[in-house]
């Protein structure tokens, strides 16, 4: 299928202050956005794609100055792809607090003339949705044909259908959960502890010291990657294969250097992540994950929390995803059915664990393609 080709981000500036769930206020902030396809005259074919932890506004296509900069969901979004940009106008937004151009910890705090660092206020999924709604307003979009996301992006899609029910026709929530389990919060805490205990963290003001807490970021990313893959997938990819620096494949080195393929993979992913991601942003986003719990205000009753939704839903999960297991998606499905909402649900038998939502699986893509065909017929796209 054809790639969407060369794309370019745009920066949108917002002068109206944004009051956060914590009570803090962000004023004069900016959000980086990318769009693909054309908005129709009725402004009825817009789809918002919400990103997960380490992703960004760059959903699809490549940048002219970097042919390797393929968007994180390029296999899903583009001409002739499941989310077909010949029919839909697709928006990707880099969330507030991120490190890819939107206002966040790396931005200059106008009150001090220095980067916010750890002083940047804690943000929530709900804060992101309110900020994204202002992006929609700027484009003149009153109602999205769909809001879609996987993992943390799926939480944002679900939050959209709760917070702006009249502005979402379809909610597409993939490999997600209505709230984090204690185990998931624990994984996030271990990752944050690795960053906070790095001597280069400097209380979050490492920018002034010209350093980055890379050791902590590496460990945080390694922990994350373990949870994104299934046991079977790791066994197939790595098994107990050795990878020694001296090239030997059949003997132990009796040291603590890298010896196993899986060790090499985790260190590579950790190093790569630490080079491009910001530690303060990692802390913020994992805390936003922890806090997401729309049923909390309803004494834990998810059915009550979803009572005022109006959208139609596609909920999808993956059989080997143990980070956000299929049972968590089924909780959402049950609550929606209890409210007599229109719900399509699929549990896809895929070996790749949580990361399966990012991969080009024919059954998964055919599901999304068919669902978007239905949406296209509804909006005349």
Swiss-Prot record:
Pathway: Amino-acid biosynthesis; L-methionine biosynthesis via de novo pathway; O-succinyl-L-homoserine from L-homoserine: step 1/1. Pfam families: Abhydrolase_1. Residues 45-360 form the AB hydrolase-1 domain. This is Homoserine O-succinyltransferase. One of its GO terms (molecular function) is homoserine O-acetyltransferase activity. The record marks 323 as: Important for acyl-CoA specificity. It is an enzyme of class 2 (transferase). GO terms for biological process: homoserine metabolic process; methionine biosynthetic process. Keywords: Acyltransferase, Amino-acid biosynthesis, Cytoplasm, Methionine biosynthesis, Transferase. One of its GO terms (cellular component) is cytoplasm. Its main location: cytoplasm. Its EC number is 2.3.1.46. The active site is at residues 151, 321, 354. It is found in: Cytoplasm. Homodimer. Transfers a succinyl group from succinyl-CoA to L-homoserine, forming succinyl-L-homoserine. It catalyses: L-homoserine + succinyl-CoA = O-succinyl-L-homoserine + CoA. Belongs to the AB hydrolase superfamily. MetX family. InterPro entries: AB_hydrolase_1, AB_hydrolase_fold, HAT_MetX-like. Substrate binds at residues 221, 355.
